[in-house]
């Protein structure tokens, strides 16, 4: 790693710590509202904790507000939520549309396990069914190792620009592009666009999000 790259990474990490700290303090009242709404709806747990692959593939516990029914994967397995998925709760639909279900990941960012901008954090050993019905391990897809060279993020090129319903392995193209060209200015731009998408509540739409 060159001196310039080291300075860039230090600036990115400092930016993450500052913004995550401000976000945690500013959003504290919202956490209480969301937690109360989740509890009142079905009485289940407020948070959902799941192992994800982080920087260089190291596992960490990603924290989210629960947006599905309790034990949603029992009988279904690790199946990604689909449009109008019956496992998603009423409160969960609002949280997903505005990305507020990922608000607790500010803590993951503050701890250094995630960044504000980067590839989406995947589960270790995550699989995907390709068009022919073949099961494919995402870790075996070209570009997986390269996307692990940076911390996973709340938002990123793939999250903002890739169509929501394309296979994740195709989103790796966006992730690889980010890894090669990321900068603090690109991060700021993606964060601002993400705020706009959140304000519109359009994270779950099929087409253009903003």
For the regions a protein language model found, what residue spans apply to each?
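Polar-ligand-bearing catalytic/cofactor-coordination segments
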Residues: 91, 101
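A hydrophobic, helix-centered structural microdomain
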Residues: 2-72, 108, 183-210
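Short, structured helix-loop boundary elements
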Residues: 8, 85-88, 151, 185
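Hydrophobic structural segments characteristic of membrane proteins
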Residues: 107-210
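Short, glycine-rich, amphipathic interfacial segments at transmembrane boundaries or analogous
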Residues: 46-87, 93, 123-124, 128-129, ...
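Short loop-to-helix capping motifs
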Residues: 29, 99-100, 113
């Amino acid at each position: 790693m060159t001196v310039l790259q080291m300075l860039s990474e230090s600036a990115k990490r400092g930016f993450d710590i500052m913004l995550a700290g401000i976000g945690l303090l500013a959003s504290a009242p919202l956490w209480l509202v969301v937690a109360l709404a989740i509890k009142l709806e079905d009485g289940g747990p407020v948070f959902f904790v799941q192992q994800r692959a982080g920087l260089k593939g190291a596992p960490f516990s990603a924290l989210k507000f629960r947006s599905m029914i309790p034990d949603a994967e029992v009988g279904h397995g690790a199946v990604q939520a689909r449009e109008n998925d019956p496992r998603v709760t009423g409160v969960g639909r609002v949280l997903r549309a505005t990305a507020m279900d990922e608000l607790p990941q500010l803590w993951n960012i503050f701890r250094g396990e995630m960044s504000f901008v980067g590839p989406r954090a995947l589960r270790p050993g995550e699989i995907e069914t390709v068009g022919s019905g073949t099961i494919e391990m995402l870790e075996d897809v070209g570009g997986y190792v390269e996307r692990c060279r940076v911390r996973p993020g709340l938002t990123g090129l793939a999250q903002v620009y890739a169509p929501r319903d394309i296979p994740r392995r195709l989103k790796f193209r966006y992730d690889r592009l980010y890894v090669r060209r990321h900068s603090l200015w690109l991060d700021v731009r993606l964060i601002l666009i993400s705020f706009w998408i959140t304000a519109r509540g359009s994270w779950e739409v099929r087409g253009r999000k903003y």
